[in-house]
Amino acid sequence: MLVVDASAVAGWLLPDEGGADPATLLVEAEPIAAPWLLWAELRNILVVNERRGRIPAGIVELAVEAVEGLGIALDTAPSGPGVLALARRHRLTVYDALYLELALRARGRLATLDAALRRAAEAEGVAVV
């Protein structure tokens, strides 16, 4: 399983973000998942970038539609104690700890552009792409 965070997905969509080409990450048979939080984070990132003029008006809906087409399963059952423990151990936000907890629980890889989350995932033995 590939767990994707909002920074990775935004990197696929926004100019100059330096994200990996999704075609190199997405294996046809590999399921993709994210915590439920991705739904709000992605939309917020896109709207803020629209407001700042980084992306044209009207692109937000098209970008969301494209991401929804990837079939990302949104997880709604995180381990509360596990998330808190990861946040404390690695000094992560609870938001970032949600992504790491899902990757650990699913025994999956994690796609992120966030340096702190990358370090925490590597420390926990999670492969980062």
Regions inferred by a protein language model and the residue ranges of each:
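Alpha-helix N-cap/helix-start capping motif
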Residues: 7, 36, 80, 114-115
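Short, well-structured N-terminal submotif of metal-dependent ribonuclease cores
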Residues: 1-37, 49-62, 124
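Short active-site oxyanion
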Residues: 29-32, 72, 105-109
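Contiguous, function-dense segments enriched for cysteine-driven chemistry
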Residues: 15-20, 62, 70, 75-77, ...
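Short glycine/serine- and small hydrophobic-enriched flexible loop segments
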Residues: 44-51, 104
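Acidic, PIN/NYN-like endoribonuclease modules and their adjacent C-terminal/linker elements
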Residues: 1, 39, 92, 100-129
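N-terminal active-site wall of soluble small-molecule enzyme domains
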Residues: 97
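Acidic catalytic patch
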Residues: 36-39, 59-90, 101
